[in-house]
């Protein structure tokens, strides 16, 4: 069982070469799950959604998946699948509401459970074992936090559930008790699991990228995890997929098959790391920012600190051309330090020393050390390009002579461009 492979991501921040390398790595992880299924003589290959990272994958990745499904079919392995929140269109006007998996289903490459509000079980018989398989594709217009099983109905005119020795349900949602609060767009509650037909005694879920397994109310519930690590943090989990054996008693020998993920490094630097003199704007007791005069009185006579770029360079020393890196810079800084921050050089270093560098400055905020005592959290606040533009225009207006109209026109144009760019990013 696998899911959350997120093939064909757009990755706009990567260079074309790195983008193709990352996409190839994601394909290799999916192929590893197929290899394992064939090598271990699996009879069912179950996919729990988000095969692709969006609804319009590249033709290259579509063809790759077609080849992998052909390998499974040639090995006599039945592929069953549902759609996830990434690869299911959010509107019926997009691709007729059909996800890319429908193409493979039309060619008999997999059995696709495309409905999001009704379970239509299918009966499979493998080596004398009758297995009822059902699934719910993600409903893209459902309210956040809703339960996909809350108003679900069962359409089983052939009595697949009644005839089956064991039942397998595929879902793409968080499971209550197996995810963190508000982690998933939708969450299956324990009450909904308990209300399921008892014939569906094995549940496989996608969406959460960490593998997990619990026995809940007589059912085996497995979160398959993702085949490649997609985010930073301990909650990301490890890469891999799930293997289990179905019997008349349910699922047995459930295990997580680990895959080697692309290396990652998460670096956090405070502004005090970049400008050690900023420590002088805090007292040792209260942590308050104090005025410039007090800071100067406390300032020891030391050699100049390393430049911010040198500090970043040291932190990136452990990265390799394979390392996906995030650098978070946090804390207070003066307006002069904000303008001194070598963003372009940091990004260039990241391109040279790592596979990619995500520079996160959301937790930077400005403060004026001459303004007197105040808490850092009540400073000027998060940096705004529009505020910086206003400050720059005011400074230029004081020093400019006879160029006010041109300055105002340039400022208006920049405001429009900045507002449009922030709107596109959803900020």
Residue ranges and their predicted role:
Residues 249-427:
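Accessory, non-catalytic peripheral segments of nucleic-acid enzymes
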Residues 39, 161-163, 197, 318-321:
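Alpha-helix termination/capping residues and helix-transition junctions
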Residues 49, 171-174, 329-332:
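Short, well-ordered beta-to-alpha junction loops that form the rim of enzyme active sites
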Residues 44, 55-70, 74-222, 226-231, ...:
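His/Asp/Glu-rich metal-coordinating catalytic cores
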Residues 3, 48-50, 82-85, 224, ...:
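Glycine-rich beta-strand-to-loop/alpha-helix junction loops that act as flexible
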Residues 1-68, 74, 404-407, 425-427:
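N-terminal active-site segment of His-dependent metallophosphoesterases
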Residues 32-41, 153, 158, 305-318:
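A short, well-ordered alpha-helical element
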